[in-house]
């Protein structure tokens, strides 16, 4: 099982909340009210890992390997919520447990392979965002936290990539669906950012007091459109590997989708 190897790799790389985060060194005076506001929203958004895990266990019910991995993913993602909450508490913020159920969502069932692809792309993008936030955060401990979370998200993306490789190896006809979802996810803008927490109807972010906070932060800390190129490169690298074709741009990806569709139709008819 892929899970066996991932368990060891992730355990080896895992950071410790009690020893690796310098909570005693936090200087709340360096944070503006806006940073506190946005950080609180990021913290609450991370709580959505609970709802995503429920979705994964439901939609991948027969896939023991993947569901086993999701148990690790859930633990690490909920630690993201916890470290941000503990940070905010050190800055004088409080969280009322009664407010949390209002954020709960049940995601509608969807094609499992598309969900898997969406989350691979989403982890790549969130790592990119957190890396930018780590460079702009005004408080040193917070900069370190964002850097740590970004590294986690990249590791999670690599784990999803392993399951996408397995899917194509076991069922090659699923490749066009993977490519189409990747193309859709690549086409993201600051004003309409694509991440699993923003694209459902309603979305996780829709449940928040300030549902536009991600767009605002991106326009402040990642202005323009060129900043997405590293995300595109990483997504296209995996799609190139799965397709066995060099894909250097979204247009290349679109052309590959068009080329594969007739083959899939013929295979299905046969």
Question: Which role does the model predict for each range below?
Answer:
Residues 1-270:
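Non-heme di-metal
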């Amino acid at each position: 099982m892929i899970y066996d190897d991932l368990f060891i790799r992730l355990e080896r790389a895992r950071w410790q909340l009690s020893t690796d985060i310098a909570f005693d060194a936090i200087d709340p005076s360096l944070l503006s009210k806006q940073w506190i506001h946005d950080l609180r929203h990021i913290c609450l958004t991370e709580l959505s890992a609970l709802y995503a895990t429920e979705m994964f266990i439901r939609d991948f019910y027969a896939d023991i390997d993947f569901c086993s991995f999701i148990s690790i993913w859930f633990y690490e993602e909920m630690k993201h919520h916890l470290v941000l909450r503990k940070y905010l508490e050190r800055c004088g913020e409080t969280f009322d447990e009664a407010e949390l159920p209002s954020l709960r969502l049940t995601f509608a069932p969807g094609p499992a392979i598309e969900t898997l692809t969406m989350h691979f792309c989403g982890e790549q993008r969130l790592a990119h965002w957190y890396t930018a936030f780590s460079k702009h955060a005004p408080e040193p401990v917070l900069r370190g936290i964002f850097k740590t979370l970004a590294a986690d998200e990249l590791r999670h993306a690599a784990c999803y990539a392993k399951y996408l490789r397995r899917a194509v190896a076991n069922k090659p006809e699923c490749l066009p669906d993977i490519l189409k979802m990747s193309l859709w996810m690549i086409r993201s803008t600051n004003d309409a950012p694509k991440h699993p927490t923003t694209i459902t109807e309603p979305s996780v972010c829709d449940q928040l007091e300030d549902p536009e906070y991600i767009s605002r932060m991106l326009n402040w800390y990642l202005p323009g459109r060129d900043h997405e190129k590293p995300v595109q490169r990483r997504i296209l690298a995996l799609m190139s590997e799965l397709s066995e074709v060099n894909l250097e741009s979204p247009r290349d990806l679109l052309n590959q989708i068009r080329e594969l569709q007739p083959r899939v139709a013929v295979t299905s008819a046969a």
